[in-house]
Amino acid sequence: MHKLIEKANTLMEALPYIRRFSGKTIVIKYGGHAMADEALKKSFAMDVILLKYIGINPVIVHGGGPQINETLKRYGIVSEFVKGMRVTDAATMGVVEMVLTGQVNKEVVGYINQHGGRAVGLSGKDGGLLLCRKLLQEVKKDDGTIEKVDIGFVGDITDVDSTILVTLEAGGFIPVIAPVGVGAGGESYNINADLVAGKVAAALKAEKLILLTDVPGVKDQEGHLLSSIALADVPALIDNGTITGGMIPKVTCCTDALTGGVHKAHIVDGRVEHAILLEIFTNVGIGTEILG
């Protein structure tokens, strides 16, 4: 009986959040270990389906770096990187687009639909969703000057046309977006999935942006999790070394989304089963929230 009461209390704890977020959009970046582990894939799918059933509109943006690396290796294509960004020539871009849109996207869509959802896969090329220009990577030279390096078909988003997403949401579907955009000449561009999630969230004026990662969240210099960060405090946390390395672009993506009209951004450990539900529907939450 005690366990049953605990379950009832959990449902009651979720009630005000269900009421608050019903009818709202939540953009979720899906990547990392959560895409590789079978139990986590199932819990992700069930979380997303539950959101839709209770009136919340989830929009998914997925990554696919490990799958791209594996396929490039199979084709004998060796990648170069500039400041962590893959140099993407035409041959590499062909593989990237094939893997993201033809393999990973369909797997994510299939898993959600297999468990009772109604997901639809698309890329940034569909409906003119993500318009891009070539991203020139800035590299600091030995003399201290900054050089802009052409890294191929890597895109910087210039415009988001969310019409197709709004249409899918209204029809009861869950959009699943592969991070491939289109240039003015119709050429394909590989885009950082975190960047796509942030830009899409801003375009939709989403209630929340959630980034699923392979870390618990942002930690202070003693290694303790920071459960909440104010937008105004982010520059100082970067300057003093609290936010470092690969966490900087993720936090920057969140801050850009907040300044674009998103209400809250969250960096959450995707290795935790039902991480999405725990963040949205519990008083304590998990991970780090960034507040505008």
Swiss-Prot record:
Disulfide bonds: none annotated. One of its GO terms (molecular function) is acetylglutamate kinase activity. One of its GO terms (biological process) is arginine biosynthetic process via ornithine. GO terms for cellular component: cytoplasm. Substrate binds at G64, G65, R86, N190. Its EC number is 2.7.2.8. It is found in: Cytoplasm. InterPro entries: AceGlu_kinase-like_sf (IPR036393), AcgluKinase_fam (IPR004662), ArgB (IPR037528), Asp/Glu/Uridylate_kinase (IPR001048), Glu/AcGlu_kinase (IPR001057), NAGK-C (IPR041727). Pathway: Amino-acid biosynthesis; L-arginine biosynthesis; N(2)-acetyl-L-ornithine from L-glutamate: step 2/4. It holds the Pfam family AA_kinase. The record marks K29, K250 as: Transition state stabilizer. Keywords: Amino-acid biosynthesis, Arginine biosynthesis, ATP-binding, Cytoplasm, Kinase, Nucleotide-binding, Transferase. It is an enzyme of class 2 (transferase). It comes from the Bacteria. Its main location: cytoplasm. It catalyses: N-acetyl-L-glutamate + ATP = N-acetyl-L-glutamyl 5-phosphate + ADP. Belongs to the acetylglutamate kinase family. ArgB subfamily. Catalyzes the ATP-dependent phosphorylation of N-acetyl-L-glutamate. This is Acetylglutamate kinase. The lineage of its organism: Bacteria, Pseudomonadati, Thermodesulfobacteriota, Desulfuromonadia, Geobacterales.
